[in-house]
Amino acid sequence: GILPFQVKKLPILLYFQYKGAIIALFTAREMCSRQEKWDNIEGKEMKIIIIGDGKVGYKLARQLSTEKYDVVLIDSDEKKLRFATDHLDIACVAGNGADAEVLKQADIAHADLAIACTSEDECNMLSCLIARKLGARHTIARVRNPIYYRQIGLLKEDLHLSMAVNPELIVADEISRLLIFPDASQIETFVKGRMELLELPVSANG
């Protein structure tokens, strides 16, 4: 089902070069912080599997590994994985993230979260589907094609997706909101976009 959380503080996304990485990063960190929702045992180290060692995947692995999560990175490019192993405190598995045998090597059955962020939407969705079937508790798929993304609402349950992330669409929506409320220092959205809470600066003179 859909998890009870929202991506927070989106305006900061505008200041990062790799917007997709940052959006996925905030999503993953928010999910990982909701341990009470996941019924985790206190003190249990959370296992996160990242599929795709591109700009997004590497940034996620670097950030989450510094926060002491048990991170496994999957990619078919062994050269990239060697670089990741040399520079990060993570485990790596070489292979296609949509291959069930590769996911089993990464111990997907004990994963609290699987994040598929390759450059191919189809691979990301299929990887998440297989990951859930093999026991991953939650999954996030990076879906950039707007046609695919519009169908996610219909397919989310069948694909067993906890969340689909479209970086470009989220940033475009945020820019639009900032243009509508240019004086707001912060904007929060509730009730699936039907309600917005604004934080506005007030001068001493009112």
Task: Show the residue positions of the predicted features.
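Cytosolic regulatory regions of ion transport systems
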Residues: 15-18, 22, 36-206
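Cationic, amphipathic, low-complexity segments that mediate targeting or membrane/lipid association
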Residues: 2-4, 10, 14
